Amino acid sequence: MSYFGTDGIRGKFGQMPITPEFALKLGFAAGKVLKRTSPKNKPLVVLGKDTRLSGYILESALQAGLNAAGVYVHLLGPLPTPAIAHLTRALHAHAGIVISASHNPYFDNGIKFFSSEGKKLPDSLQEEINKELEKDLFIEDTANLGKSVRVTDANGRYIEFCKSTFPYHFDLNNLKIVVDCAHGAAYSVGPSVFRELGAKVVALYNEPDGLNINENCGSTHPESLQKAVVEHGADLGIAFDGDADRVVMVDKFGSLIDGDHILYILATQAKNKPAGVVGTVMSNMALEVALEKANVGFVRAKVGDRYVLQALEENGWVTGGEPSGHILTLDKSTTGDAIIAALQVLTVMVEQNKALHELVHDFKLYPQVLVNVRLEQMLDPYSIPALVAEFNKAEEQLKGRGRILIRKSGTEPVIRVMVEGDNEQEVKTLAEHLANAVRSQAQVA
């Protein structure tokens, strides 16, 4: 069986495969594969994590397995996922490993790998690790074990890297920024980056206790940030998720600036406009229309930063992302980086001398309605001619003014019916009509 999903290995801590025993075996299996594929006799792996309590247990197990396989490990401590990607390259490591479940609650955790280039591990290497996991853990040579050391300046290295992506002749001296750290991996480095560039920073949710990561805070719960920006009279707010690979922002009036807004700013307001942008099937149609008017290319990928990255590489572009706040700027970083994405927006604000709300003044998201249709048993909506006819009819009705998206959930018997368009009432009516059509056909089936 394959333990790897689209974003590494993830699950509830204490249940397979997120257990100390499995992490030990995984470290050993990965170490064996890295030794075979490494030009060095003793390959180096950098290992970082977010702030979950279970991360410390998994870290100990992983490093023990890696050391037993003869791999040297540099322990980075709690740091954003993109920081691990950067330090994998900066420290000339053969691979990087992150222990994190991103925006999930504290009781979940995950393990994912980066290649020596700071990119997601190739599928071929993941398959080799899977095969190695089927073997017994057997230490052949006790004279050639690896060892682990803690990197004491990891935070500083990453802070300097982030600052290097912000124009050296710019500063943030006149800005007051509220930063929501989600009690996560950016709790220290996030506020530090903006302070060192001159901003007055109000840090929120920056006291992790191992259990409060993402709890009613961060990019998935920006409500308290929206309130805090107004209360503090700040110029803007920035919210990360637990591992700081997602970011959403808030203007001085408390309005939310999501991933679609950020892509709009980077694609149409920046001094150097990109040739094209990659969104996903969830990107609002308003973004597609705005980019077309600005003569900026646009393509949609499947949901997931892995697919956004793939589409960027296929098109030779550097800018892409998702409404959730996964933003990739491949000319700055190899993976989605919340701090760097925020800095790119701040760069546009400084170079144009405009407030955040002014940058999106002409950009209005189309009304969007999402209806989750729960079924007794999953069905494929596109295998039923009557439903396909309804979908086609709806698409024809919205032609040029909106769109529909019908998706099956990958984890539960739910059909997601999404409709968006330029008329809110029409969108609501159409979404409910299509949802009812799915319900009716499910009863017939």
From Swiss-Prot:
GO terms for molecular function: magnesium ion binding; phosphoglucosamine mutase activity; phosphomannomutase activity. Mg(2+) binds at residues 102, 241, 243, 245. One of its GO terms (biological process) is UDP-N-acetylglucosamine biosynthetic process. Activated by phosphorylation. The modification Phosphoserine is found at residue 102. Binds 1 Mg(2+) ion per subunit. The active site is at residue 102. Keywords: Isomerase, Magnesium, Metal-binding, Phosphoprotein. Belongs to the phosphohexose mutase family. This is Phosphoglucosamine mutase. It comes from Acinetobacter baumannii (strain ACICU).
